[in-house]
Structure formats: C-alpha cells, structure tokens
Amino acid sequence: MAVPARHTSKAKKNKRRTHYKLTAPSVKFDETTGDYSRSHRVSLKGYYKGRKIAKANEAK
C-alpha cells in the first residue's frame, strides 16, 4: 500500500485548496425580453443577440 512519506500540514493542505472555489455565473440583462440570461446562450424566450432564434417552451 502507498503511504505518504510525511504528514501534510494544515497550511500546505489549505494552500493547495485555495483554488477550489465556485464562481458566480455571468448574467446579463436582455433588453429585448426584459429578462436576465447567461452570456452566449439562448434566453428562455428563445432570443439570442436580440433576434428570435428558437421557439420557446410553453407551459401547459
């Protein structure tokens, strides 16, 4: 079995884990629909860059 040669200190462990973080998704306001949507993605109403591209899913 592999066993670590030395004990990993709290400081060493925490320095390694500083890059494990969540980033908030980038959200922009769409003037066409008046809703917020993520960048470079089609909005829920089917608009992309101010143009209607897709048919929006209607709730039944």
Swiss-Prot record:
Keywords: Ribonucleoprotein, Ribosomal protein
Gene Ontology molecular function terms on file: structural constituent of ribosome
Region feature (Disordered): 1-21
Signal peptide: none
Family of the protein in this entry: Belongs to the bacterial ribosomal protein bL32 family.
PANTHER family: 50S RIBOSOMAL PROTEIN L32 (PTHR35534), LARGE RIBOSOMAL SUBUNIT PROTEIN BL32 (PTHR35534:SF1)
Name the record gives this protein: Large ribosomal subunit protein bL32
Organism listed in the record: Streptococcus equi subsp. zooepidemicus (strain H70)
